[in-house]
């Protein structure tokens, strides 16, 4: 799970290629949530939102009940049309009238990138390439600086300089 606007390609690549995760996890699918009221503006302003919709197996449309009257119907039609254009294969559910049940959300089978659009396959391939390149640079980044013989490791986080991320591995249950 990512929170807010995150590029799904690095997360998917990690889950599908990291040996530790492969041994412990099985990726069944991707669910993304789209706000029916603000979704168009979000898709217009954030490439990550477009990617989230494009890779999803399930799209959950929230706040549908707030779209009332003729204007609301037009907004709902427009956001649904946009989502269908970005990802015609995803199952679209709303939170209205209990449509997004656990069974509908989580019964989807294994994630299969070969069944995704060419853009999604391209994003995943680019992530695999970038991850491999960074790994190769880290393996070879060794030098003597200021009398200290050590390795430098690139920050593989692709955020700006104000956002940092890290991970750690435990061998026992926490």
What role is predicted for each listed range?
Residues 2-102:
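Phosphate/Mg2+-binding loops and adjacent switch elements
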Residues 51, 58, 66-174:
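C-terminal accessory "lid"/substrate-recognition subdomains
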